[in-house]
């Protein structure tokens, strides 16, 4: 399973939102991987990113561990984070996904269940499961969601994304997030950012045997 990704953050003289997005192809494991984190604390964001890197470099627990065991492991790690912190993260390994959020950062999107796709917003969750092609995952701060939830839901609806090349879909999603960011800013939104991930089936983003890495982070 491949992934279309896009991100947005409000450019500020003194950054208050930090994002990280990486997309890779592991030839040996034959796995497509995407992970992203968002926080208003740069040190915490780097800490979460390092924990995910450790997960990817260790034994392939994503195939040998049960979903409940992975969830318990990550819940324990997140319990050590300051209770007043704001963060959200996602790790997609093919169709398997880890999702977590806390405080002023939100986890939301379109999730397929029982043949139906609906918009959901979670708070303070740590979940592990399988995602189907067309599931749309969004990590965003509360302000962006508060000012533009209806518009975000509309542009991220799977059928609104199109069926053309994955790179074109990603570019279009990037532009749309930027448009909504400007709209939220005009409405008074501050310190905003979002990462969007759409697992899809179909053509590969990378040519055969090639690995791709992308990192997007405010400075």
Task: Please annotate each region the language model reported.
Residues 2, 33, 91-94:
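N-terminal nucleophile
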Residues 8-9, 22-44, 101, 130-155, ...:
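Conserved beta-strand-loop-short alpha-helix elements that form
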Residues 56-110, 181-199:
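Catalytic core of PPM/PP2C metal-dependent serine/threonine phosphatase domains
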Residues 31-33, 96-98, 106-107, 115-116, ...:
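Hydrophobic residues embedded in beta-strands of well-ordered beta-sheets
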Residues 15-28, 83-89, 94, 115-150:
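Acidic loop->beta-strand submotif enriched in PP2C/PPM serine/threonine phosphatases
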Residues 14-70:
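Primarily the active-site beta-strand->alpha-helix module of PP2C/PPM metal-dependent phosphatases
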Residues 2-9, 132-133, 145-219:
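C-terminal catalytic subdomain
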């Amino acid at each position: 399973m491949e992934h279309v990704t896009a991100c947005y953050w409000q450019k500020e003289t003194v950054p208050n939102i930090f994002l990280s997005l990486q997309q890779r192809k592991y030839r040996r494991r034959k796995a497509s991987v995407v992970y992203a984190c968002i926080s208003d604390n740069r040190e915490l964001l780097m800490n979460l990113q390092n924990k995910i890197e450790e997960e990817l470099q260790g034994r392939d627990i994503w195939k040998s561990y049960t979903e409940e065991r992975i969830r318990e492991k990550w819940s324990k790690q997140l319990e050590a984070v300051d209770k007043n912190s704001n963060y959200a993260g996602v790790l997609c390994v093919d169709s398997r996904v880890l999702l977590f959020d806390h405080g002023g950062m939100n986890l939301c999107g379109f999730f397929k269940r029982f043949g139906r796709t609906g918009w959901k917003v979670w708070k303070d969750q740590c979940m592990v499961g399988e995602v189907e092609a067309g599931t749309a995952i969004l990590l965003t701060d509360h302000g962006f969601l508060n000012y533009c939830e209806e518009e975000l839901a509309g542009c991220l609806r799977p059928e609104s994304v199109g069926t053309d090349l994955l790179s074109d879909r990603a570019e279009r999603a990037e532009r749309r997030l930027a448009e909504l960011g400007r709209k939220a800013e005009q409405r008074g939104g501050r310190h905003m950012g979002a990462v969007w991930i759409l697992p899809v089936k179909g053509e590969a983003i990378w040519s055969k045997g090639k690995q791709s890495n992308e990192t997007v982070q405010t400075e």
